[in-house]
Amino acid sequence: MPTEALRPFFLFILLFCLITPLPAVANEVEETESSLDVMGKVLDHDYVEIAGKKIYLPRIFYVDGNFYFYSNTQSALESGEFVESEIGGIVRADGKPITIDFSISAHLIFFWLGVFLTFLITWLAARRYRRGVGSETEPRGVLQNLFEVFFVFVRDDIAKEYIPGEKYHKYVNYLFSVFLAISFMNLFGLFPWGITPTANLTVTATLAGITFLITQVSGTRDHWEHVFMFPGVHPLVRIILTPVEIIGLFTKPFALAIRLFANMLSGKIMIVSILGLIFVFTDMFGAWLGVGSSVFWVLLTALLYVLKGFIALLQAYIFTLLSAVFIGMAAEEHHHEDHESSVTTTAEATAKT
């Protein structure tokens, strides 16, 4: 895909990241002023905040074979069945933990929103292509052109590059969907009162788990032979290598989940921490220095928002790239003499990230 085709989009992202921080930073300052609890700003909540107003979400508990439904946390506490824990959260009135908590949280809401937008955009694009717009004629409109740019990018530069032969056709739809969904989820945090669901390990672990399942289902006979048998390797050496390969099957999705989670969480923590320095300086040196230094901290935070916008897309690309690499390794019909070449290709792809 020619780089020139992506330039208008990157220009749009740059302008978007320059404008968006203004209300977003103001919102962060307002939230940080009431509390300097950094982790409290990045953890999941039982509410979503829109225009400064909190909308509390339903609580659903499964306890001893029964489901309990409440409109919000306050209703659950008022029922007498549950009480607030000393370390946070809700437990049963007898002090025992809840068996399964199916409650809807803020991260889950924005996760669903990212999935919904991905489905909506792909459905609208598919409908236009069925009508011949883009297939028989040139794509029309900014959205369809952007859709085609990213789809061709994922297909040609990721799927076709790292999944052997014609097998990439089976996986390009998944890779494009996960790229689009993660991009949306990462970018949500740039909006005022927005939340980044990929800063939740449960979300990233779920996405990595899907890649893990697809990878194992795609595994060829050659792939599993190299996991358990190692053709051409001395039997005593297999005793060492086989456990390492089995562990490697699980460390790959683990690395996918942790990489995305850590990068998105650290960005939010850094922004809240820098804004918190305004109030630290105010408490330590007086209001005059706190207010005077606030200009610098707010400008620095605005620049971090710009960087965070690019990182949001970069992390979506890395997750998609590594997913394609892992699927390609499992789907490859290789022989023992080609194993070293396969490992080298994987190392090169990982080095790009």
Stretch-by-stretch model annotation:
Residues 2, 25-353:
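Selective transmembrane helix interface/packing segments
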